[in-house]
A protein has these predicted regions:
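Active-site-adjacent substrate-binding region
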Residues: 124-244
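Soluble metallo-hydrolase cores and metallopeptidase-like ectodomains found primarily
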Residues: 1-54, 73
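Surface-exposed patches in mature extracellular/periplasmic domains of secreted proteins
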Residues: 1-10, 83-86, 160-167, 244
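Loop/turn elements at helix/coil->beta-strand transitions in domains of secreted/extracellular proteins
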Residues: 2, 34-38, 82-87, 112-117, ...
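Extracellular/periplasmic catalytic domains that process cell-envelope and extracellular macromolecules
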Residues: 12-16, 24-34, 80-83, 97, ...
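Active-site-proximal beta-strand/loop segments in catalytic clefts of secreted hydrolases
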Residues: 9, 24-26, 41-45, 71-72, ...
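Acidic/histidine-rich catalytic neighborhood of metal-dependent amide-processing enzymes
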Residues: 16-19, 48-145, 149, 170
Length: 244
């Protein structure tokens, strides 16, 4: 349990699923006013091309959702209290086109809420056979400076390398913040060519649709790999929001 003051907001949308925002109040209000809020994000939705089929979403994006939950649990157990405000976001409707995060961004822009940095956790638990564990550091639709900062974090807090990769479109909720002009970054389970997309998507003509194969019992699903993202996330918020 966190020692810092926390509050939870259920951010409602026109569609049934809400976005969940956990706000952790920093001890230094002046610092928050100067910097803005530090955000860790993940999308909580999953989808299947055929609506009647299951869409378990263990990796996309149960893994990112759990990464945030475990980060929060570990920080609370350690007695962490931030100096500046931190938020944990679980977005709705990412699979529909970043709809939940875009609605949150629009709300923050409208209310003039400053954002110091945002890091997205989307697909964090798969290691392809015959490959070594790596972070896939996305270099497009992100903040170059914040991306470089993540490389420094990995060197100091992890024992696996970061490998640059491109997705060629705004592939997850970080892109909503990038479009609004706020610094955002995205690290995934591996470089694009070695991530789990081939297992959980099926190619139909020229489009990719999620299937019911995205389960935690598939070969390559790795909770130890997910734990590395938890450590990286902890480093991200502690280094940026500090430890009061």
């Amino acid at each position: 349990m966190l020692e810092a003051h926390t509050s939870i907001k259920v951010f409602q949308h026109p569609w049934p699923q809400s976005t969940i925002i956990l706000h952790v109040k920093g001890s230094n209000e002046t610092l928050t006013e100067e910097r803005g809020v530090t955000i860790l994000g993940a999308h909580q939705d999953s989808v299947n091309f055929v609506p009647v089929f299951a869409a378990p979403g263990a990796d996309d994006n149960g893994s990112g959702t759990v990464t945030l939950l475990e980060t929060l649990r570990a920080l609370g157990k350690a007695g962490w209290k931030p100096a500046s405000d931190v938020e944990f976001h679980w977005y709705s409707a990412e699979e529909g086109g970043l709809l939940g995060s875009q609605a949150v961004v629009d709300d923050y822009v409208r209310r003039h809420i400053r954002v110091y940095a945002m890091m997205q956790q989307d697909m964090t638990a798969y290691v392809k056979s015959d490959t070594k564990e790596r972070f896939g550091l996305v270099t497009d639709y992100v903040s170059p400076k914040l991306t470089q900062f993540l490389e420094l974090l990995a060197k100091h807090y992890s024992d696996i390398p970061m490998v640059h990769t491109k997705l060629h479109y705004g592939a997850s909720d970080h892109a909503s913040w990038t479009r609004a002009g706020w610094p955002s970054a995205f690290v995934m389970e591996a470089p694009f060519e070695d991530c789990n997309l081939r297992m959980i998507h099926v190619c139909v003509f020229v489009s990719h649709f999620q299937t019911s194969l995205d389960r935690y019992d598939i070969p390559g699903f790795s909770f130890p790999h997910l734990l590395r993202f938890v450590k990286l996330s902890m480093a991200f918020v502690v280094e940026l929001a500090e430890w009061a």
